[in-house]
From Swiss-Prot:
Post-translational modification N5-methylglutamine, affected residues: 251
Alphabetical keyword list: Cytoplasm, Methylation, Protein biosynthesis
UniProt keyword Cytoplasm, yes or no: yes
Protein name according to UniProt: Peptide chain release factor 2
Pfam families tied to this protein: PCRF, RF-1
Alphabetical list of SUPFAM superfamilies matching this protein: Release factor
A cellular-component GO term for this protein: cytoplasm
Taxon lineage: Bacteria, Pseudomonadati, Campylobacterota, Epsilonproteobacteria, Campylobacterales
Source organism (scientific name): Helicobacter acinonychis (strain Sheeba)
Amino acid sequence: MDNYTYSELLKSLQNKCDNIALIIKPEKVKQKLERIEKEQEDPNFWQDVLKARDTNKEKVRLNRLLETYQKTKNALDESVELFEIAQNDNDEVTLSLLYEEAPILEHGVQKVEIEIMLSGEHDASNAIITIQPGAGGTESQDWASILYRMYLRWAERRGFKSEILDYQDGEEAGIKGVAFIIKGENAYGYLKNESGVHRLVRISPFDANAKRHTSFASVQISPELDDDIDIEIDEKDVRYDYYRASGAGGQHVNKTESAVRITHFPTGIVVQCQNDRSQHKNKASALKMLKSKLYELELEKQQSTAKNEEKSEIGWGHQIRSYVLAPYQQVKDARSNIAYSNVEAILDGDIDAILEGVLIAKA
C-alpha cells in the first residue's frame, strides 16, 4: 500500500461513515435511549412483561449500534489525523503502521453496516435450521452431515447454544435430515440468507475408483417466533403422525411413540420433532417449527421473493453456494459473487465473512 491508496481508502470509509450517520441518526438514537431509560424508571413499566422485554431488547440493540458506530468513527478520525501528521513529517514508521491497520479499519466500518442490516423484525431471534440431503444417497447424506457440523461449529465459535429438534441417521453414513435451533443474539439475522441449495464437489470417500462426485443439500432457515406472535393453523389443514424415536446416532430408542410429525396440507410443509421423551413437548416444538416456517413463507410472499427449494427437486436449481474440494479448493457464494480459498476453515464453522458478505450484497 502507498500514500495514494491509503488516502483513497480513508475517503471511501469517511463517505461510508457519513452515509451511516444519515441512516442511524446518532443524536436521535441517544434521545431514544434516554426516553427508554426514563420509561424503565417508572415502577409500572415492568407490569407489562412482554412490552418490557421488547423495550429492553430494543435498548440493547440501540446501545450496541451506537457504541459500534462511535468506536469506528473515533478510530477513523484518529487515522485521518495521524495520516496527515505522518505525511507532513515523512514519518515512515507511522505510515507503515497505518497501512497495516487498514484492514481493521475497513472491518470496523463493515461491522457498523452489518449492525444496521440486522435491525429487521426478527433478526435478533434464534434460528431454526432444517437440512435435507438431495438425490445421491450416501454422498448427499454425508454432505448434509458436513453442513450440520459447519453450522454447529459456527454457533460454538460465537458462544451460541444449539438444540436438536429432529435427527435421522443416514443409511451408511451422514444424515437423512436434521432440524435444530441455534440460540443466540442475531442468530436468525446472520443465518437468514443461508436458505437454499448448497453444492459440494469432491473426490468421493465412498467411491473405490476415487471419482469426483457432486452432491446437494437443502438448508432452510426460519426465526424462532415468540409465543405472543399469533399464527393461525386450522386443525383440518394438518395431520399428526406419532412414531417411535431414536436419538442422534441411534441412541435412546423409545418404547413409546413420542416422536411427532406434522404435515401441513395447504403448503406441503412437513416438520417433525423427537428430541424429548414427552410426546406433548415434541408436539409443542413441532408446532413451533411449523408456525416459524409458515411465517417465513408469508414473509417471502410479501417481499415477492418466494423461494421454492423445499418444493423443487434438490439439484442444479436454486443454488446459493458451491463448495469445491477437487480439483481445486474454493467456496463461492452466488449472491455476493465472492470466492474463498480457506475451505477447511469454512467447513469448520468459520463462515462469518461469507455471511456478512451476503448481507452487504443483499442490502
